[in-house]
């Protein structure tokens, strides 16, 4: 599953990655964090000077070694590592296209209130729709401005104005 944390809000409290970790379950069940601005996923791009073909051969070689090792030790975490390498390789090609919302119609951007690349909750809602269209089964959107310990009357409109419209748009768009 994919996790996205938006920027902005009244009181952007930190959110720990343990909230989408697998805990005591196998690590294949943990979430993949997408950054809401900048590079969508850390360390998915090829190193400088490495072509996609070279990277593909490297992933195949590592997979072969991991499969050989797994026949000996039969560790579920090895199978998870193989799947993670393969997923990262596929993501190198698919994530840039996913994150490019420049071809979205203007009325869709307006419906969400999204400004591409700003890292807002609205932009993340639009990306969530695009992820769902590509088969991602679980998408968790965090908006970090909801930790109210006071000032509800003063700040509720601010928080709702950042989330109501894009949430409605996402539901309508699905």
State each model region's role.
Residues 1-174:
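Ligand-binding pockets and gating/stacking loops
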């Amino acid at each position: 599953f994919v996790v996205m944390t938006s920027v902005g809000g009244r009181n952007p409290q930190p959110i720990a990655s343990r909230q989408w970790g697998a805990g005591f379950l196998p690590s294949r069940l943990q979430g993949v964090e997408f950054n809401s601005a900048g590079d969508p996923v850390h360390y998915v791009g090829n190193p400088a000077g490495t072509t996609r073909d070279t990277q593909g051969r490297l992933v195949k070689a590592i997979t072969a070694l991991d499969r050989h090792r797994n026949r000996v030790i039969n560790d579920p975490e090895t199978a998870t590592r193989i799947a993670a390498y393969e997923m990262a390789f596929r993501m190198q090609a698919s994530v840039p296209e996913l994150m490019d919302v420049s071809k979205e119609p203007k009325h869709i951007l307006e419906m969400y209130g999204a400004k591409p690349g700003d890292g807002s909750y609205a932009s993340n809602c639009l990306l969530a729709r695009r992820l769902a269209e590509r088969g991602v089964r679980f998408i968790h959107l965090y908006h970090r401005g909801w930790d109210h310990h006071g000032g509800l009357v003063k700040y509720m409109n601010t928080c709702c104005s950042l989330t109501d419209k894009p949430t409605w748009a996402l539901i309508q768009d699905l």
